[in-house]
Amino acid sequence: SSERESERWIASDFAFNTSGFVTAYKLKYTDTDPDFREEMNIAYTFNYNADGQMQKISMKVDGKDDEGSYSESGEINYTYNNKVLEKIEAKSKNITCSQTYEYTQAIKNTYNAMPLLLLPEALASDDCVFNVFAITGYLGNAGANLPTAMTIKNTDLEDPSENSTERYNLSYTLNENKAISSYTLSGYGETMTFPCDWTNF
């Protein structure tokens, strides 16, 4: 899928473990916009802990745009406490993005759901294939509880003016069977609600 007609995403070379969770795939992105052409190849590998929860994501990127060729790599690490997700930290070059979760009440994740707020922010916003894998259960077991707050901290060692910290309160609307119908982020005078319509996948 793409936001512009000039963009294309093609995923390939999928690998899975014995639990059915994805352990690797490749993603090719192309943008044929005449004002800024780009081609990018991303290779992902995924590691899980003994509880079947995502532990580490490794990425290698090779690309080419109007400014020339480039290569970079990065990794995303997950931290849990008693099967409850505490932190996701993504590192690439001199940039670190951490997502820290708070749990002020025990809201059980009854159906092992993985809404986008439990994914690394960069991948959730840029990689539609990753999102589909998460929503359909191919990225391992989710946290045992649903968080009630989230803090996103971006640190740029080369340009500290880009550093930022944002904190959001989280709430959920559950169906009669305790499945997530929607979730809401609130903070800084804004409230954003996102539906969880699993039938679209």
Each language-model region and where it sits:
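Buried hydrophobic residues that stabilize the cores of well-folded domains
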Residues: 1-201
